Design a protein with these regions (language model features):
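Preference for long, amphipathic alpha-helical scaffolds in soluble/luminal domains
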Residues: 1-177
């Protein structure tokens, strides 16, 4: 959606809907970050299948998929109801959770941005945005000499000057550009 592709009749959307409706890789805690089949192929170490790692690393993909499902899929479907439950659980846990995995913050940003249109509950939006802002600011690698290694660059979360995270991070964003 960020790239402007919103035609839900497009074959790519239809394929996504079909996959999500199948509930493949959906567990009681969300969608798996990695799957057992990963271990059959050459891979980076973080792609090794681990159900324990999935419980943390799935936060980001689950939040993102929940936002997508709740915005685009049939409200009467089984996967919609599960996404609604998972989204509520994620939002309820945001303020107290300690570990978000590598993609958790980005997933939460997508879910919280969609929240005003989802009608899934009454949440304290300023508190949610405050927590996300805190997490974004804490996760961005401030040492530009370390940017050549794996780490969180400002552009991971800040895609434009209109981002709510831009004002507090303008200087570091400008260094990345």
């Amino acid at each position: 959606q960020r790239i402007g592709m919103t035609d839900t009749s497009h074959p790519i959307y239809k394929g996504i809907f079909e996959y999500l409706s199948s509930e493949k890789d959906l567990t009681d805690y969300g969608w798996r970050f990695n799957v057992p089949e990963n271990n059959n192929y050459p891979r980076a170490p973080w792609w090794n299948y681990s159900e324990d790692a999935n419980k943390t690393e799935s936060i980001g993909p689950t939040c993102g998929l929940c936002a997508f499902i709740l915005q685009n899929m049939d409200k009467t479907s089984s996967v919609y109801k599960k996404a609604e439950t998972l989204a509520k659980q994620a939002l309820d846990n945001l303020l107290t959770a300690k570990n978000f995995g590598d993609m958790g913050i980005g997933g939460y940003i997508g879910l919280i941005d969609a929240l005003p249109t989802l009608n899934i509950g009454d949440y304290d939006m300023p508190a949610l945005y405050s927590k996300i802002n805190e997490l974004v600011n804490a996760s961005i690698e401030r040492d530009v000499n370390k940017w050549q290694y794996y780490g969180v660059l400002p552009s991971t979360y800040i895609h434009s000057p209109q981002s709510p995270f831009y004002p507090a991070n303008k200087d570091i964003v400008d260094q990345e550009i």
